[in-house]
Amino acid sequence: MGSIRGNIEEPISQSLTRQNSLYSLKLHEVQTHLGSSGKPLGSMNLDELLKTVLPPAEEGLVRQGSLTLPRDLSKKTVDEVWRDIQQDKNGNGTSTTTTHKQPTLGEITLEDLLLRAGVVTETVVPQENVVNIASNGQWVEYHHQPQQQQGFMTYPVCEMQDMVMMGGLSDTPQAPGRKRVAGEIVEKTVERRQKRMIKNRESAARSRARKQAYTHELEIKVSRLEEENEKLRRLKEVEKILPSEPPPDPKWKLRRTNSASL
């Protein structure tokens, strides 16, 4: 049955939504209203069944291809589809000898048959209380009570998070005080961020100024040292060029004399 559920188009679900009351009828009730002159439902294929039970307005959709079925499924009779459903149920491990009575083909509704066959992927919610059924060119009104369906609505995780952030799952609007407080928090956050950015820029500017002053001071010292080095080099060259003069004689000289007689 996995292949039967594969290639079903959305127009089928939309059509069943419009004619949901009709699909709530049991198959033996549909056969009764169709009359004895009609073809038995068990020998009809699904394509014939849909064309038979649908009103003329919906038959136009069938002819136009809006209500298309997979070819392998549309050619199967109702009995064959029901047999496949029972085999699939037994193959999945469902016991046939249970305390609950298993429904027969005539006891299930047309909607249940299409659901189990995989034609419809979601349950159709009844919208009307009166159904007009085409039978040998005549319309028979069938009244039934709407079936109330209860269940939990599922939400994606991202939508749940968005709804929680917006203040809950209810549609009640937030109080003006909450909006004002939230706006003030946002404004304070933006103001703090701007002040932090200004401080960072000022600190970076002061750091660049200190680096530039230190570099300028080093450049001045280097230039002074280079000038002194150049002066010393020139003085040394001048000393090499000038001739060397002998040292001057002393003013008083020592002389050797004889003071004793021999």
Curated annotation (Swiss-Prot):
Any GO BP annotation: regulation of abscisic acid biosynthetic process
SUPFAM superfamilies on file: Leucine zipper domain
Cellular localisation: Nucleus
Annotated segments matching region Disordered: 239-262
Main location: nucleus
GO MF term set: DNA binding; DNA-binding transcription activator activity; DNA-binding transcription factor activity; sequence-specific DNA binding; transcription cis-regulatory region binding
Residue segments, region Leucine-zipper: 218-232
Keyword line: Abscisic acid signaling pathway, Activator, DNA-binding, Nucleus, Phosphoprotein, Transcription, Transcription regulation
UniProt feature, compositional bias: Basic and acidic residues: 239-252
Keyword Nucleus: yes
Keyword Transcription regulation: yes
Region feature Basic motif, mapped onto this chain: 192-211
Cellular component GO terms held in the UniProt record: nucleus
Residues modified as Phosphoserine: 21, 43, 66
PANTHER family listed in its UniProt record: ABSCISIC ACID-INSENSITIVE 5-LIKE PROTEIN 3, CAMP-RESPONSE ELEMENT BINDING PROTEIN-RELATED
Similarity annotation: Belongs to the bZIP family. ABI5 subfamily.
Binding partners and assembly: DNA-binding heterodimer with ABI5/DPBF1, DPBF2 or AREB3/DPBF3. Interacts with the AFP proteins AFP2, AFP3 and AFP4.
Full protein name: ABSCISIC ACID-INSENSITIVE 5-like protein 3
Native source organism of the sequence: Arabidopsis thaliana (Mouse-ear cress)
